[in-house]
């Protein structure tokens, strides 16, 4: 298994993984699937901002992906990013999520980011455990802020401080 930077050719596999999460999980709070052009536009937008899109690959097959983007689009949040990590269902439980997220944390540090935020559906105990194990702490619990599959969803926010800068002008 290798982790590498994605390229445009990976967008079809990324779309498949994304759409599975849309249809079968509460990890993505969208109701409709997307086409490859949608994920290609998403990929290109990340590239324009200098943000990484990583894929895990085994025997030439994309098994997962990870990325981060602006947490909020205001200048004051320029050192804070929110990330996403998704693993193909046939490859879950093999530690790929941990490997992708660890590499993504390294990339955020390389990009000079200060905080990485995770927004996790509160019933996703595996994701919350993974984030705790990598140093993330719970910073907020937001009950019933989303809906999917005919039920209210709670949101857990977790964050990881990526550096030790005492003040923003030290960044």
From Swiss-Prot:
It catalyses: L-methionine sulfoximine + acetyl-CoA = N-acetyl-L-methionine sulfoximine + CoA + H(+); L-methionine sulfone + acetyl-CoA = N-acetyl-L-methionine sulfone + CoA + H(+). Acetyl-CoA binds at residues 85-87, 93-98, 124, 133. The lineage of its organism: Bacteria, Pseudomonadati, Pseudomonadota, Gammaproteobacteria, Enterobacterales. InterPro entries: Acyl_CoA_acyltransferase, GNAT_dom. Homodimer. Pfam families: Acetyltransf_1. This is L-methionine sulfoximine/L-methionine sulfone acetyltransferase. Residues 1-163 form the N-acetyltransferase domain. Disruption phenotype: In minimal medium, cells lacking this gene grow normally with MSO, but growth is inhibited by MSX. In rich medium, growth of cells lacking this gene are partially inhibited by MSX, only when its concentration is at least 50 uM.
